[in-house]
Regions:
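Active-site-adjacent structural elements in enzyme catalytic cores
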Residues: 1-316
């Protein structure tokens, strides 16, 4: 723990230097901020887990500048992989593929697969291009809590757990999409949707045909039943259900049922604002079960999971 503030910069070259020296860098992406380490430095990768208080068996996602580099770390030779990578990268899509031998067990949690993607944020694209290799990066927050979409969120969550002599926050402004990447397992036939995200399942299906829902044990980031959780109790209200009889000064309402793009962009900031308001209950108006609404429903359901769901007529 430290009282000296962590350094903040908008210079990708400075971030590359930190990574090459074995430090951690909080990076902006189009989805959320990630906490990155050079994938070839196991001690640095281990610090990701301790900084986040993340279980060591929970796999990380590798981020690279382009497909050619991605193929050094994962088997992306299948037609499915090539179609998705060439169409959706850079962008909010993670492919779960067979790992290459040089990928460390600490990155994959000992699994034979690895998640990999090409982020679209311009600052992180510059960082990755200059770095020339690969970085491992989960979200830059304490494990299981609300994801960060601004540099200030990172400071609030893990600023005191970073080393000002070794680490850095790369400030790229607010994240554009606001929810994590879609994860597709391309090792199965048909491919499986492991986590809905910034690219809809409908879009994926248009590209590669049928995509199954996830089955079997958790094998990628974001698959735990409880995740993205605020401190405040949550209640999820489906379209058409009545709101509970609770005075307005005791609740914080998050409307995810209307403009889905805006709802995704604002979701984690709204959950943080609700916690800061110290209300007794967050009421989330649920989006439709399609498009970006599927990702929003996933995040909201997991955010409320450890509190019970209850109907619209009870606090749960």
């Amino acid at each position: 723990m430290t009282t000296r503030p962590i350094g903040i910069s908008s210079d990708p070259s400075r971030a590359v230097e930190v990574l090459r020296n074995g430090g951690l860098v909080a990076i902006p992406t189009e989805t959320v901020y990630g906490l990155a380490a050079d994938v070839t430095m196991p001690e640095a990768v281990e610090r990701i887990f301790s900084t986040k208080d993340r279980p060591t068996g929970h796999p990380l996602i590798i981020h690279v500048a382009h497909l050619e580099i991605a193929e050094r770390w994962a088997d992306l030779s299948s037609p499915t992989a090539q179609i998705l990578a060439t169409t959706c990268w850079p962008g909010p899509l993670t492919l779960l593929a067979k790992r290459r031998p040089q990928v460390s067990d600490i990155v994959t949690g000992g699994r034979p697969t690895v998640g990999i993607r090409v982020p679209a944020h311009p600052l992180t694209q510059q960082l990755l291009a200059e770095h020339g290799g690969a970085i491992a990066a989960p979200s830059a927050n304490r494990f299981g809590k609300v994801s960060p979409t601004t540099a200030q969120h990172v400071i609030d969550d893990i600023g005191n757990h970073l080393d000002p002599d070794r680490d850095l926050i790369l400030d790229g402004g607010p994240c554009g999409v606001g929810v994590e990447s879609t994860i597709i397992d391309i090792t199965t036939n048909p491919a499986q949707l492991l986590r809905p995200g910034g690219i809809s399942a409908e879009t994926i299906s248009e590209l590669i045909g049928d995509v199954d829902e996830a089955s079997g044990p958790s094998r990628a980031a974001g698959m735990m039943a409880s995740h993205y959780a605020p401190r405040t109790k949550m209640m999820l209200v489906e379209p058409g259900d009545p709101l509970p009889d609770t005075s307005s000064d005791e609740v914080y309402i998050i409307d995810c049922a209307q403009d889905l793009v805006k709802a995704a962009h604002d979701l984690y900031s709204e959950l943080r604002a609700a916690d800061a308001a110290e209300v007794s209950l967050i009421i989330a108006l649920m989006p439709p079960k399609e498009g970006l609404g599927t990702a929003l429903r996933d995040r909201l359901t997991k955010a409320a999971a450890d509190q019970g769901r209850g109907s619209a007529n009870q606090v749960g």
